[in-house]
């Protein structure tokens, strides 16, 4: 949803600026953990309850994560700001945008690889190596299996899609034959 992304962006950018002064990986872990907690309907219910104070919500969120960064004043201020502005539900989007900023800084990108068959370690390593050469950046792959592809893979890196699946080739042939 574009609106959520627009609202979440300043929070992600502000948190990233704070993280640049310390350990970006640790902050990334914290924001990912907070996003997981914020996805729980029970947490959102408690956070929106008039019977629970904002301070209690902040303490609940910080207690629910394992990251050592959560003990710091910056983390508490960040969560307090989200609670005060009723933005807890934005944490998953904030985490996503924080990861994008982190990847951009590292010259990396997330790669979603969908394969018709499970990829073993050597095959995946070879595929990722070739994709890194093609996209000219370090890739962080996530792999899914979708047998409807029939064969081949579909790779999504940012807004670029590389589809070498048999299903895509058949669709291309069908379009060419019916045109």
Swiss-Prot record:
Localization in the cell: Cell inner membrane
GO CC terms in record: plasma membrane; proton-transporting ATP synthase complex
InterPro entries for this protein: ATP_synth_OSCP/delta_N_sf, ATPase_OSCP/dsu
Membrane association type: Peripheral membrane protein
SUPFAM superfamilies assigned to the protein according to its UniProt record, in alphabetical order: N-terminal domain of the delta subunit of the F1F0-ATP synthase
GO MF entry, a single one: proton-transporting ATP synthase activity, rotational mechanism
Keywords recorded for this protein, A-Z: ATP synthesis, Cell inner membrane, Cell membrane, CF(1), Hydrogen ion transport, Ion transport, Membrane, Transport
Keyword set includes Nucleotide-binding: no
Main subcellular localisation: membrane
Subunit structure: F-type ATPases have 2 components, F(1) - the catalytic core - and F(0) - the membrane proton channel. F(1) has five subunits: alpha(3), beta(3), gamma(1), delta(1), epsilon(1). F(0) has three main subunits: a(1), b(2) and c(10-14). The alpha and beta chains form an alternating ring which encloses part of the gamma chain. F(1) is attached to F(0) by a central stalk formed by the gamma and epsilon chains, while a peripheral stalk is formed by the delta and b chains.
HAMAP family given in the database record: ATP_synth_delta_bact (MF_01416)
Family, similarity comment: Belongs to the ATPase delta chain family.
Function of the protein: F(1)F(0) ATP synthase produces ATP from ADP in the presence of a proton or sodium gradient. F-type ATPases consist of two structural domains, F(1) containing the extramembraneous catalytic core and F(0) containing the membrane proton channel, linked together by a central stalk and a peripheral stalk. During catalysis, ATP synthesis in the catalytic domain of F(1) is coupled via a rotary mechanism of the central stalk subunits to proton translocation. This protein is part of the stalk that links CF(0) to CF(1). It either transmits conformational changes from CF(0) to CF(1) or is implicated in proton conduction.
Protein known as: ATP synthase subunit delta
Organism: Burkholderia ambifaria (strain MC40-6)
Gene that this polypeptide is encoded by: atpH
């Amino acid at each position: 949803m574009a609106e959520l992304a627009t609202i979440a962006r300043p929070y992600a950018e502000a948190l990233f600026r704070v993280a640049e002064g310390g350990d970006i990986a640790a902050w990334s872990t914290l924001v990912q953990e907070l996003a997981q907690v914020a996805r729980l309907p029970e947490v959102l219910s408690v956070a929106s309850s008039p019977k629970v104070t904002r301070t209690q919500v902040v303490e609940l969120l910080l207690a629910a994560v394992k990251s050592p960064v959560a003990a710091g004043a910056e983390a508490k201020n960040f969560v307090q700001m989200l609670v005060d502005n009723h933005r807890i539900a934005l944490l998953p989007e904030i985490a996503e945008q924080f990861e994008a900023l982190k990847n951009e800084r590292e010259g990396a990108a997330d790669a979603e690889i969908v394969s018709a068959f499970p990829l073993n370690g050597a095959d995946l390593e070879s595929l990722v190596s070739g994709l890194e050469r093609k996209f000219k950046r370090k890739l962080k792959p996530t792999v899914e299996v979708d047998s409807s592809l029939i064969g081949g893979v579909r790779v999504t890196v940012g807004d670029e899609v590389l589809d070498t699946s048999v299903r895509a080739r058949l669709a291309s042939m069908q379009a060419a034959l019916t045109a």
